[in-house]
Each structure stands twice: as C-alpha cells, then as structure tokens.
C-alpha cells in the first residue's frame, strides 16, 4: 500500500516563475538564439518562446538549422515588433489606440496567439503552450485589453493595486494580485517596458469575456468597451454627460473567436443600438481632444468608430464585479462616477482618430451578432502596466509609438505626455515640444500685444502733463547736465534732455517708428509665420512719417515683416548723410544688416550702414540692390565673414562716425523681410529684455577723437537718435549704452547695497577701441542667416572678426563703478566690450520674462535694465526732453525701494536704508576709490574682491574660480 501511494507536488507559481525567467533571460540577452530585425533595428529572442506563441514562427524555425538565424520582417515596424515581443514574453503590453490597429495587423501576419485569429477547429484559438502567457491553460485564446483605474486620482499609493484584482483567475478580467506582483518584480528593470510606454501588454492568451460596457465616455479612451448586452439591447452607451445606465441585459455567450473579432459592426444591425450609438458618436467627437487611455482594444476602436460605445472601466473591481464575472449576465460596466473618474485619470493620451478606426475595422473581420456579442472565457479589457503606475507617479504615460502616417502635428500635441524614453520618444516628444513652444509663442505675442501698447499708452497719458524739468529729484540717483536718473516704485527713471536741435518733424517720425515698434515688438509669428497686417500698416505709417517731414529720411519699406520671437530686440542703425545727401528708397531686397544674436534672419527695412572712409562729407546714393550686394555700398574695409564657430568671444559694437554725419538709431524688433529665408530656430533670451519702445529723441553727440572724456556739445555734428535699446542684444547695448554713458557723462549707477547696474560705459574703452580702429568710421553689424553668422566689420589694420556664438547668449552685465563727484568714470574695457556668453537653458522655448520672475544672477547683484519706455512724453512742439523708465530685473532692489532709504551717499547720491551700509559703501566703493582687484581672465577690475568673485562666477564660469581668503571658492 505504501509503495503504491504517490504524492502530487504542485508548483503553484510555476507559470509566473517560468514567465519571469524567460523575461529575465530576454532582458539579459541570455541564451538568445534568434534575432528579429525591423526597420534596421534588432531584437534578440528565444526560439522556444517564439515557437510557442506563434505557429508561424514555429514553422519558420523548424526549417532553420542555423544556430542563430536572423529574421528580417519587412512590413513590420520596430515598435510593433517590440510590442509583440513584450506581449509574447509577458502576456500583456500597453499600446495606444492609434497603434492598436497596426499592431493587430502585424500580429495577425505573424500569427501571434491571442492577437490574431489563429483559428483552429470550432473557431477556438489555440492555447499558448509555452511560458509566453500568464494564464496558460486557464484562459482561452483571445487577447484581452485590461483597463484599470488610475489610483493616482485619489491617492498615489493606490497605484500598486490599481491593476491587481483579487479572486480566482477564472472569469476575472485581470491577473490575480499575486501573479501581478511577481510580474512586477520581474519587470522592474525591464528595458522594454521602462523605455517604451506603448508596449502592448494585454494579457494575451488568457483572455476571457469581452464585455462592452456602453460607457461611451469618449473623454477617456480607456475603452474597455464591454460588448455586454448585445448592441440590440442598446449597447449601453454610458456617456459621461448623459450617464445613462444600461440595464443588465442577458448577453448570449458566443465563441471566443468572435469575442476577438467583436467590432461595432455588431452594434450596427441592432435597432436599439442606433440611438445609443449616435449619442456615443457625438460624445466621441465632442470630447475627442481629451481622450486619455491606457490602451484600447481594436474592437473598441471599431466600436467607437461605428457608433459603438466606448466603455470606461473605472476599476478592476468594477470590471470583475460588474461585468466580468457575470458571464452572460454581466453588468454593463462601471457607474458614471467611476467612468468620469477614469475619464480624467492620467494615462496615455489617445486620440479617437476616425482613420485609425477605419483602419482597424478594415484590418479585422467583423462578426455581426444581433444580441450575442460577448465571449465565454475571454474578456477584452485594457490593463495599464503597474510599472507605469509606480514609475510615472503623477505624470502621463506617453504613447511613443504613434503612427506617424496617421498623426498630424495637432494630434502629436494631444498625445504628448511624459516621455518614457524608447525608440519613438525623441521624435514624438520633440515634435510636441516644438509645437507647444509655438503655441506659447503665439500666446505670449497676444499677451504682449495687449500689455505693451496699453502700458505705453497709460504711461504716456499719465505723464503728458508733466513738464520737461519736473523730475523727481528727491529720489535722484544720478544727475548730469543732460541725464537724470531717478527712482520710483517700479524701478529707475531715466530723464534725458535733448542734445542739439531736433525738429518736431523728426520727433513725429520717431513717434511713428515708436508706434511701429510697439506693435512689432509684440507681434510674433513662428519660424514660417506670416507677417501681420498690423505691422505692415504701421510700417507704411512710419514710412509716411519718415518721408513727409524730412526729405533725407527715406520711407520705410512697406513689405511685411516677420517677427520670429518677441524676446529678441534689436537696434537698427541708420546713418543719414546730412542735408545734401539723399538716400533712395530701398527695395525689399536692400536691407541693412543689424546687430542681433544668432539664428534670426535680421533684414531690417532701414537704410544700410553707409560708411564714410576718411571723408567728412560723402554723398552716397543707393539704388535698389539685392541684399547680398548691400555690403558693397559700405566701405571696402567691411569684410563679410561667414562664421559658424566662434573664434573670438568679443563682440565690439561701438559705433563711431566722422563729423558731419548723423546716425539715427531706429529700433525695429526682429524685422525680417517677407522674401527672406524662414527662421531656422527661435531664441529664448535667458535674461531680461526691453519691452516697450523708447522712442523719443534721445540724442548723443559723438566725435571720433580719442579724448578720455567726451562732452555732449555738438562738436562734430554726429547725432544719435535712439529709439529702442536692447540690453539683451550685446552689440546693440554695447553701442548704445556706451554712447549714453560716454557722451552724457553719466556717473555709474550703483544700488544701495553696493551692487551695480549694468548701464555704464567708460570713455576709456571707447576711445581705446576707436584708437584700434585708427579713428575711422567703424560700424560692426551682424546679419544672421538661419545657420550662419555674417560679420561685417571694418578695420584699418587687421580683419578682426567678432562672433556671436550660435547657441550662446551674449549679455551685458556691466559692473559699473561710482566715481567722485567730478564725474570721472573709470571702468574696464573688457567688461563692456567683451560680452560674456551665457548658455541658453532652453534654446527653443520662448517665454516673456517679467522682472518679478527674473533673478538676474542673484549672487552677483548685477542688474540689467529690463524695460525702457517713455514715462513723460513731451509736447511734440517742445522736443527738448524725454523721460525713460528703466525697470530693473531683480526684485532685490528692496532697500532702494523702501521709503525709509534715507541715508544718501554724498558722493553719488545713492540712498541706503541702513547707515552702516552707507558707511561701508563710502569707505569701500565710493569716494573716488580706484578699482584694485583685476580679473585674471579679462581686463576687468573690481573695487572689492567680492565683486571680482562675482564677476568671475558670472562671466568666466568655465574658468577656475578664485580662492577666497577663507580658503573656499568664491
């Protein structure tokens, strides 16, 4: 008796263990003996798994006697192949609805069990014999699409159990909790799942009852559309808006093959289905943009296309209790609450594309059953991978296997979510990012259009009554003969008195240009954007203003202009030869080069920079010439150098002129002629920018004599008329600000806490630069083609090329110093001439930066003027003074903004809140103290060693930092 007794040793976890072993072997590429190739990419696999999961592979591998054959799948995409591999090895895969039809078609061609017909006798799909499936013998062959409620809506910790369903595996819509945990452990480091969120992981051969709940909630394409209750019974369209609850209808049990082929064509014949189908279809199209899903069954896709209801399984428990276990009497699905909850849960964004629907319908045969559209042992539900719940947390799982043929840019926007990496992630996510930035660009343009002109008008309206000399001298920070800088609650105010006689006509002209700027500054189009009629009209108006009052000023071109980015300001320099010279109106091709950072084609519809070489009066008549030849109208010493890589980090943009010349600086922002090439990329300035047009007649007289301190008398007739200052544009700001400080004798501006405002340009650097140029007329302009830089530079001795590195932002952070009351200015040339580059954090994101958001190198306390716009607009007939508001970029101006800042420096007039701070300022910084801390990497000198450390950190981040006296780096 005892000898005949036998014990049955049952390995309860045999299947899951075996599956995890194969999965691990695949991850480590251990014992792989065949290779599958698609689209030039390779996936290694095991013959035994392929043979077990596909009769096609089994037959193919039996005929191969190679040790390691390579199968090249011609019509299968790599993402589809990868999804099928995951499906075969793990029994389930997550796939987007857009890719579902293509995947099923490929799986059908490869005869993957559970994903294709694979009909054997009686329409029963063969069971997977190998470890490629979770529920080997228990479940029958149709694939299931499981859907789980994303517990992240309620609690983040519930994600682990979101896909887990307790209970027996028979009749359950999802694997048991124990088996799911095993699979999760085995796949924690799975490269396929972690790198590809669109891997189809529907528990394949273990599928059971496909129940189509009528939850036609199109918002959540989590269509576990239970085809319960044959469509004749109403197809249970449980749209979220209608929230109609389908009654429990007896679903006739059909063959599982038919469950695998259930389409909404089942719903078509039934008269009762038509009404609910129409409702579902309406909701489908209405909420199409918001459809988020973890995965979608092909049948569900077809169902939704032909009016079938999209079901939202809010919970696995809902699926089990309400629909799955019931068999023929399955419930119609989750209640509307769970449906709506699922609708908004974070999942793969899937668009209900009719094309995809049609494709899926055409790729699969439809079984039309009047009242019986449910299958016996297989339930088609979509189950999100628990790994994604664990890993993605609050972020959406992004479908990275978007069928590019079916996807448009808008759809890519909709499907964009958290990228899980993988093969398709780079293209899809990059495209979405690109479009998103385009949208943000447009929104910013609209916001700017609403904000800037209104702000300018408000400022003008409020300040028009004020007279020229009514400056707030109580808060005066700096005062010279011609420029007074005061401070208000918003920032610093620059009051500029007229230098020289300027006619009211020119004032009107500048106002017209200002209006144009105010509009152009906030009008943004994309790289291929079309110009707006507003700009064209303003250009025409500006042209009329140019031509009417002054015959020497030619009309602006009326061709449309494109503004690639609202962040990019520029300075256009227009030189006008005095009275006897007439400059012809320019053809659109004739556009002057302008100063501007890289990648923006800057063709400004202004007169080009005409150079006069050793001659005080030279009449230049410019006919219509093509753009490429416009440099020939400049001096021969202008060498056009096309550079891509920088060889010199210094950009010199000091503009000097001989006597008798008038240079009008008219700011046009990002002007590009209509016939120019499209913009290659956008630039986001990572630092502050000028927002409003500063249009009024600010004139600065310049001579080319290398005198240490230039005065603002009209010694040589050279005049500058500045319409807009761009401090983010290194070339423009260098030229304009240097002239501002040089010729108006502005004492350097310094904040109360000893920090500097980047505005001052010392005369020494300008004269030194002029000496290097031999006293010639020297204009450095840079015209940017999409991928190259053209540096036009005139130099007497050598061809000195100054580049702006493409991909870097040249920004001025001028560490100004406060001198004695004599008004002498000491500053180093390098600080002003060398524009230290700052890497762009995000090269193609464009965003409007406000002073509150912008911390301008907080450690260095170096401020860049963000906004200059006229506060006081003087009378048109009295263009003798102008007031500019200089808003600074850092919010740490608090001490200066505080009304209690009552301690004033006797040397520079700065106010300090604390007397100790004023004392430190006077002892260390002010009172004629000379800079004594030279920078080891440039010619900059600082008054304090701490400022030198700030300078090195800011402008030489790649160089070794200074060692502090305390033994730590500053």
From Swiss-Prot:
It comes from the Eukaryota. Keywords: Developmental protein, Differentiation, DNA-binding, Metal-binding, Neurogenesis, Nucleus, Repeat, Transcription, Transcription regulation, Zinc, Zinc-finger. Residues 32-97 form the BTB domain. It is found in: Nucleus. One of its GO terms (biological process) is dendrite morphogenesis. It holds the Pfam family BTB. SMART domains: BTB, ZnF_C2H2. One of its GO terms (cellular component) is nucleus. Residues 162-175, 228-251, 263-293, 329-340, 819-828 have a biased composition (Low complexity). GO terms for molecular function: DNA binding; DNA-binding transcription factor activity; zinc ion binding. Gene3D superfamilies: Classic Zinc Finger (3.30.160.60), Potassium Channel Kv1.1, Chain A (3.30.710.10). InterPro entries: BTB/POZ_dom, Dros_DevTransReg, SKP1/BTB/POZ_sf, Znf_C2H2_sf, Znf_C2H2_type. A zinc finger (C2H2-type) spans 903-925, 933-955. By stage 11, isoform F is expressed throughout the mesoderm whereas isoform T, and at low levels isoform I, is expressed throughout the ectoderm. Isoform K is expressed in both mesoderm and ectoderm. Expression becomes restricted during later stages; starting from stage 14 to 15, isoform F is expressed in the gut. Isoform I is expressed in the CNS. Isoform I and isoform F show expression in the epithelium starting at stage 14, though for isoform I the CNS expression remains predominant. Residues 115-200, 228-340, 447-468, 790-843 are annotated as: Disordered. Residues 447-456, 808-818 have a biased composition (Polar residues). Putative transcription factor required for axon growth and guidance in the central and peripheral nervous systems. Repels CNS axons away from the midline by promoting the expression of the midline repellent sli and its receptor robo. PANTHER family: BTB DOMAIN TRANSCRIPTION FACTOR, LONGITUDINALS LACKING PROTEIN, ISOFORMS F_I_K_T. This is Longitudinals lacking protein, isoforms F/I/K/T.
């Amino acid at each position: 008796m005892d000898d005949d007794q036998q014990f049955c040793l049952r390995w309860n976890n045999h299947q899951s263990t075996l599956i995890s072993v194969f999965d691990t072997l695949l991850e480590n590429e251990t014992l792989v003996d065949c290779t599958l190739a698609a689209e030039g990419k390779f996936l290694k696999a095991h013959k035994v798994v392929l043979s077990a999961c596909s009769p096609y592979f089994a037959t193919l591998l039996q005929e191969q006697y190679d040790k390691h054959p390579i199968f090249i799948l011609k019509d299968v995409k790599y993402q589809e192949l990868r999804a099928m591999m995951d499906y075969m090895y793990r029994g389930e895969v997550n796939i987007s609805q857009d890719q579902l039809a293509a995947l099923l078609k490929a799986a059908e061609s490869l005869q993957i069990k559970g994903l294709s017909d694979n009909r054997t006798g009686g329409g029963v799909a063969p069971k997977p014999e190998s470890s490629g499936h979770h529920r080997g013998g228990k479940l029958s062959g149709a694939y299931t699409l499981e859907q789980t409620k994303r517990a992240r809506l309620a609690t983040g910790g519930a994600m682990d159990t979101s896909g887990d369903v307790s209970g027996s595996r028979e009749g359950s819509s999802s694997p048991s909790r124990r088996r799911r945990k095993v699979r999760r452990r085995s796949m924690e480091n799975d490269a396929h799942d972690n790198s590809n969120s669109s891997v189809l992981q529907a528990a394949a051969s273990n599928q059971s009852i496909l129940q189509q709940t009528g939850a036609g909630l199109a918002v959540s394409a989590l269509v576990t559309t239970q085809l319960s209750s044959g469509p004749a019974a109403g197809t249970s369209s449980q749209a979220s808006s209608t929230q109609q609850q389908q009654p429990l209808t007896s679903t006739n049990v059909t063959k599982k093959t038919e469950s695998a082929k259930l389409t909404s064509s089942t719903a078509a014949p039934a008269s009762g289905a038509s009404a609910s189908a129409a409702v579902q279809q309406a909701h489908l199209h209405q909420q199409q943009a918001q459809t988020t899903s973890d995965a979608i069954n092909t049948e569900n896709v077809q169902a939704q296309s032909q009016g079938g209801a999209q079901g939202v399984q809010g919970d696995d428990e809902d699926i089990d209790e309400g629909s799955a276990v019931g068999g023929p009497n399955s419930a119609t699905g989750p209640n509307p609450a769970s449906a709506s909850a699922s609708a908004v849960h974070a999942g793969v964004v899937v668009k209900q594309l009719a094309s995809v629907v049609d494709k899926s319908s055409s790729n699969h045969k439809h079984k039309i059953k009047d009242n019986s559209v449910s299958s016996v042992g297989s339930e088609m539900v979509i189950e999100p991978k628990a790994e994604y719940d664990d890993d993605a947390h609050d972020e959406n799982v992004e479908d990275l296997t978007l069928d590019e043929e079916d996807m448009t840019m808008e759809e890519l926007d909709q499907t964009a979510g958290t990228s899980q990496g993988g093969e398709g992630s780079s293209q899809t996510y990059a495209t979405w990012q690109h479009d998103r930035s385009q949208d943000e660009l447009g929104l910013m343009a609209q916001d700017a259009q609403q904000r800037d002109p209104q702000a300018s008008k408000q400022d003008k309206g409020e300040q028009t009554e004020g007279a020229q000399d009514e400056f707030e001298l109580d808060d005066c920070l700096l005062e010279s003969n011609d420029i007074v800088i005061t401070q208000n609650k918003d920032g610093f105010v620059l009051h500029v008195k007229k230098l020289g006689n300027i006619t009211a006509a020119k004032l009107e002209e500048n106002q017209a240009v200002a209006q144009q700027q105010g509009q152009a500054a906030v009008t943004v189009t994309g790289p291929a954007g079309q110009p707006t009629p507003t700009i064209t009209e303003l250009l025409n108006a500006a042209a009329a203003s140019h031509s009417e009052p002054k015959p020497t000023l030619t009309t602006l071109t009326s061709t449309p202009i494109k503004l690639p980015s609202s962040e990019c300001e520029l300075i256009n320099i227009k030189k006008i030869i005095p009275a006897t010279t007439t400059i012809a109106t320019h053809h659109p091709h004739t556009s002057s080069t302008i100063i501007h950072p890289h990648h923006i084609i800057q063709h400004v519809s202004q007169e080009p920079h005409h150079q006069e070489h050793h001659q005080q009066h030279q009449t230049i008549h410019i006919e219509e010439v093509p753009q490429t030849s416009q440099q020939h109208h400049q001096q021969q010493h202008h060498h056009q150098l096309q550079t891509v890589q920088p060889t010199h980090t210094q950009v010199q943009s000091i503009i000097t002129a001989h006597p008798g010349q008038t240079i009008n600086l008219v700011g046009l922002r990002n002007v590009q002629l209509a016939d120019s090439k499209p913009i290659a990329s956008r630039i986001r300035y990572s630092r502050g920018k000028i927002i409003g047009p500063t249009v009024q007649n600010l004139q600065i007289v310049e001579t080319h004599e290398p005198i240490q301190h230039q005065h603002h008398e009209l010694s040589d007739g050279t005049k500058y008329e500045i319409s807009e200052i761009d401090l983010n544009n290194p070339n423009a700001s260098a030229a304009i600000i240097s002239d501002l400080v040089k010729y108006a004798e502005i004492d350097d501006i310094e904040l109360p806490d000893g920090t500097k405002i980047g505005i001052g340009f010392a005369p020494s650097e300008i004269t030194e630069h002029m000496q290097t140029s031999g006293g010639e007329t020297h204009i450095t302009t840079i015209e940017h083609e999409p991928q190259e830089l053209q540096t036009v530079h005139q130099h007497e001795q050598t061809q000195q090329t100054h580049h702006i590195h493409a991909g870097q932002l040249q920004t001025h952070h001028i560490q100004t110093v406060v001198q004695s009351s004599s008004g002498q200015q000491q500053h180093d040339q390098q600080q002003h001439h060398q524009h230290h580059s700052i890497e762009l954090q995000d090269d193609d994101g464009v965003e409007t930066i406000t002073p509150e958001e912008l911390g301008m190198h907080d450690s260095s306390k170096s401020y860049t003027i963000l906004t200059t716009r006229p506060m006081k607009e003087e009378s048109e007939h009295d263009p003798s003074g102008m007031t500019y508001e200089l808003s600074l970029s850092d919010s740490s101006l608090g001490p200066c903004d505080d009304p209690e800042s009552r301690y004033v420096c006797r040397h520079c007039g700065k106010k300090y809140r604390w007397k100790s701070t004023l004392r430190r300022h006077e002892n260390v910084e002010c009172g004629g103290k000379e800079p004594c801390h030279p920078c080891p990497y440039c010619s900059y000198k600082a008054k304090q060693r701490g400022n030198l450390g700030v300078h090195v950190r800011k402008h030489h981040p790649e160089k070794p930092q200074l060692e502090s006296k305390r033994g730590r780096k500053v």
